[in-house]
Amino acid sequence: MELIEKHASFGGWQNVYRHYSQSLKCEMNVGVYLPPKAENEKLPVLYWLSGLTCNEQNFITKSGMQRYAAEHNIIVVAPDTSPRGSHVADADRYDLGQGAGFYLNATQAPWNEHYKMYDYIRNELPNLVMHHFPATARKSISGHSMGGLGALVLALRNPDEYASVSAFSPIVSPSQVPWGQQAFAAYLGENKDAWLDYDPVSLISQGQRVAEIMVDQGLSDDFYAEQLRTPNLEKICQEMNIKTLIRYHEGYDHSYYFVSSFIGEHIAYHANKLNMR
């Protein structure tokens, strides 16, 4: 991995690395925050998945997470949201193509050549992190919007791999809302059964489980009713007896002003779970 940015932050280092991804067949950037304790010992990892139009920079520059990661001794890994490059398929819209990988493995041309974000986040990136950084095998996952969807899907499909999962403003029923329907039709085709593998509410209804789900949702979020549908997640978790910590916040929107207001509580939540054995 090639170091391309290095910034001192709260006694540790906020770095950005570039590497070639075998899964995605392109160069990828990834943000890695190494807290002070990483100089002397191995630490657990929190993976953060960002939302539509984002790259590795949004979370590391806007959330203020470094203060809390340093306090709780957690390495934070923030990858890009899709494969990148002039040779990678793209679309003339913000919610499909580069910047909108939806953390799935595409099966339809032209997307299936590069868009394997599920494999990248689940397998390739953790292996790289374990190899290049002082990381233990303990990991948790979180994300915002499309990234919250990705975090929930990865945790629900691989419950033994993640100590905990949380999300800000996640797309919980993508097969039922425009963002998800448009992306899934392009990436996965018209067989809607394939869509359900990347739909948190559907996965839970089929019996997939995690110990607990933490979600924060702003009630002044313009996408709340049409695209996000947080109550759908709350309802299915109640029906399937999955413990939740779902909090609704008056006045908060879909932006990083919202994420930065509560990211400290999410990192503390994950730190507690990561340190349990």
UniProtKB/Swiss-Prot annotation:
This protein's source sits in the domain of life called Bacteria
Listed under catalytic activity are: S-formylglutathione + H2O = formate + glutathione + H(+)
Assigned keywords, A-Z = Hydrolase, Serine esterase
**Active site residues per record:** 145 (charge relay system), 221 (charge relay system), 254 (charge relay system)
Q: Which Pfam families match?
A: Esterase
Q: What class of enzyme is it?
A: hydrolase
Question: Is the Hydrolase keyword given for this protein?
Answer: yes
Q: Name one GO biological process term.
A: formaldehyde catabolic process
* EC number(s) from the headed UniProt entry: 3.1.2.12
GO MF assignments: carboxylic ester hydrolase activity; S-formylglutathione hydrolase activity
**Presence of keyword tRNA processing:** no
What are the annotated GO cellular component locations?
Answer: cytosol
- What SUPFAM superfamilies does the database record attribute to this sequence? alpha/beta-Hydrolases (SSF53474)
Q: What does this protein do?
A: Serine hydrolase involved in the detoxification of formaldehyde. Hydrolyzes S-formylglutathione to glutathione and formate.
User: What protein family does this chain belong to?
Assistant: Belongs to the esterase D family.
Q: What is this protein called?
A: S-formylglutathione hydrolase FrmB
Q: Which organism is it from?
A: Escherichia coli O6:K15:H31 (strain 536 / UPEC)
Q: Which gene encodes it?
A: frmB
